[in-house]
Regions:
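Non-catalytic, topology-defining segments of multipass membrane proteins
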Residues: 1-154
Length: 154
C-alpha cells in the first residue's frame, strides 16, 4: 500500500462527504481502521514503563467519565434523538469532546444510530446482535461498507 493511499484513508476518517461507496461493497474488515484501535490499547501498556500516580489515575478517570457523558448525553440523546435543546457553544464543545472518545464525529454517529432505530434487530440494522457479538460491537464500523456518513438519515 502506497504512502498516498494510507494518507488518503487517514484523511477520509475525518471528512468522507466526497467518498462514494457502492452498495455491494464487501463487509470485510478494513485493517487501516483497525490499526488505531490496536495502537490505542497497546499504548495503555506504557503505564508499566513510565509509571503512574494517583493524580494521573484521577485525570484518566475524569477524562473517561467526561467523554462517556459526551457520547451518552450529546451524541446519543442530543444529536441522534434531539431529546433536548442547547446552545451552539455546548453543541461544539461536547461534539469535539465526544470525538476524542474515538467514536468519529457527531453527525456520523447520529446518522448510523438513527438508521439502527429504523431497522432495529432486522437484517438492515448494521449493528444488530443477529450479526454476531463481535460484529455488533465493533466489526460493523471497521468495514468500508459502513464507513460513510448516512446523510439521508440526519
Amino acid at each position: 500500500m502506497s504512502l498516498q493511499t494510507v494518507f488518503t484513508k487517514v484523511l477520509i476518517w475525518f471528512d468522507n462527504s466526497n467518498v462514494k461507496i457502492a452498495d455491494n461493497v464487501s463487509e470485510a474488515i478494513d485493517w487501516m481502521r483497525v490499526i488505531p484501535f490496536i495502537l490505542m490499547h497497546l499504548v495503555c501498556l506504557l503505564v508499566f514503563v513510565v509509571g503512574w500516580s494517583p493524580v494521573a489515575l484521577w485525570v484518566a478517570l475524569a477524562s473517561y467519565l467526561l467523554r462517556m457523558f459526551a457520547i451518552t448525553a450529546f451524541y446519543h440523546r442530543y444529536f441522534s434523538h434531539k431529546a433536548f435543546k442547547t446552545g451552539r457553544i455546548a453543541q461544539f464543545l461536547f461534539g469535539v469532546l465526544g470525538s476524542t472518545a474515538t467514536q468519529r464525529g457527531p453527525i456520523w454517529w447520529a446518522s448510523h444510530h438513527r438508521r439502527h432505530h429504523v431497522h432495529s434487530d432486522k437484517d438492515k440494522d448494521i449493528h444488530s446482535p443477529r450479526h454476531g457479538f463481535l460484529w455488533s460491537h465493533m466489526g460493523w464500523f471497521l468495514c468500508l461498507k459502513n464507513f460513510t456518513t448516512q446523510e439521508h438519515c440526519v
